[in-house]
Amino acid sequence: MDRPRQNDHLGVNRIGKNIRKSPLHQSTFAASTSNGAAPRLQTQPQVYNISKNDFRSIVQQLTGSPSRESLPRPPQNNSLRPQNTRLQRIRPSPLTQLNRPAVPLPSMAPPQSHPQFARQPPHQPPFPQTTQQPMMGHRDQFWSNTAESPVSEYMRYLQSSLGDSGPNANQMQPGHEQRPYIPGHEQRPYVPGNEQQPYMPGNEQRPYIPGHEQRSYMPAQSQSQSQPQPQPQPQQHMMPGPQPRMNMQGPLQPNQYLPPPGLVPSPVPHNLPSPRFNAPVPVTPTQPSPMFSQMYGGFPSPRYNGFGPLQSPTSQFLQPSPTGYPNMFSPRSPYPLLSPGVQYPQPLTPNFSFSQIAQQGSLGPGAGPSQGPPQPPPSPGLMFPLSPSGFFPMPSPRWNDY
């Protein structure tokens, strides 16, 4: 009971009267303020009116002498920094000197596409790039033009070769050693007929076969194409993608172009075998044999005219039936609608005989009879999974060597 009485001054005032200072405290506070007013005015802090430049020196003077001694040290350190030779050695050259040669070099871009003509000494000496120019080798000269990348150089070469397919293209392809960095052109030098032709994209995608050099004297080549004899391939270089297909009657039709391999084939009239049918090797990889085009409609198997060892591009087994499965034993296909490459049944003419000349290929002449349709062993569809050429396993009239 004694504790609440002792702590009354510490408790909450429950009466609710206003809290004021006691009169004794107010009298002592007034006396202390009146007595201390005079010395407070005398002991006011000093005010310094200084400028920005003198602020550091005044602060150092007020704080003490050690900071004043450290003041001349930073200028000494700054004076030693420009004398550092390592920083001067690794300092890069100014960017203005690198961007300056980019103005005259785009006009010299066509000669720059060849490594032999890449060096341009008249344009390089005016710029004092002594540290970079001696290190630039034969192929590093391409990087002198910082605004051009190898891809842009290659695209400019393609545009120049496509646009100027006349004397300019022949001038740029006298020898294939001038284009070592172009993909796909490493395979072209051993094809004799391609030196005079302009480079086209998609031309490097065709497989080159040993019989490719016989294009210039093929009988169907001189009849079908309207180009002169020394240039047997301008017809093919007009289109960068699929090539014109050889009709069964011989002449090329420009409106008949092959679809990409493996896509929907287009119907081709199969009335008579092409004169190229009796040739030892095919003319182009994308112009298959006439009998094979009945089924595939232009599926690009390179060596089907000569029964070469090359397999079908999509077959994992032996070669499918070169004549196409629709031509089983009768001239008319029993499954015209189920065959991928035949949109309508087409009878073969009587002169489409399996002669000895037509059977000559890379594996030698066959022994098939020339009178009537033969009865050869069945096609691989009977013993293996179905070949991509058809849906039904049917014997092939041309497989008499197997």
From Swiss-Prot:
Coiled coil: none annotated. GO terms for cellular component: polar nucleus. Pfam families: VQ. Keywords: Nucleus, Stress response. Disulfide bonds: none annotated. The keyword Ligase does not apply. Modulates seed size by negatively regulating the cellularization of syncytial endosperm. May function by binding and modulating the activity of WRKY10 transcription factor. This is Protein HAIKU1. It comes from Arabidopsis thaliana. The lineage of its organism: Eukaryota, Viridiplantae, Streptophyta, Embryophyta, Tracheophyta.
